[in-house]
Amino acid sequence: MTAVLDAWAALAFLRGEPAASRVKELILAEEALISSINLGEALYWTERRLGQRQAREEVDRLRPVLVVEDPDWPLVGVAAHLKAGGGLSYADAFCVATAQRHDATLYTGDPEILALDVPVEMVDLRAIS
């Protein structure tokens, strides 16, 4: 099984939120994949909270334990199509497109993503307490 994480999941892990335990399980099982776009989103949110240097240190500790996938042109096309449909950010479109590409389960707590009608299995991390 492959698990795709979005920025919401990465941030939950970095902040030690309740869903962090589930994200950690996925990482330890070597099943976790994240788009570099979504990891970048987690980086900028962390920088807003902690500053640039500390944010880089936090996210850099996460990078080696995840498979970080850079988008290629076909994936950009899928993400652009998802974004054109409305209802989600461009960065969010990349985690959905990445999950579609890998026929993977998407782990998120983002209500905009969870509300999508797309052929991707999703796990709502907000339900974990």
Name what the model sees in each region.
Residues 5-6, 34-36, 88-89, 110, ...:
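Histidine- and aromatic-rich ligand-binding microenvironments
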Residues 31, 67, 119-121:
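Conserved beta-strand segments of alpha/beta enzyme cores
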Residues 23-30, 62-63, 99, 113-117:
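Alpha-helix C-terminal capping segments
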Residues 67-109:
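Active-site neighborhoods of divalent-metal-dependent phosphate/nucleic-acid chemistry enzymes
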Residues 1-34, 47-60, 129:
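Short, well-structured N-terminal submotif of metal-dependent ribonuclease cores
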Residues 9-10, 38, 75, 95, ...:
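Alpha-helix capping/helix-boundary segments
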Residues 24, 43-44, 63, 80:
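Amphipathic alpha-helical segments within well-ordered protein domains
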Residues 96-129:
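Acidic, PIN/NYN-like endoribonuclease modules and their adjacent C-terminal/linker elements
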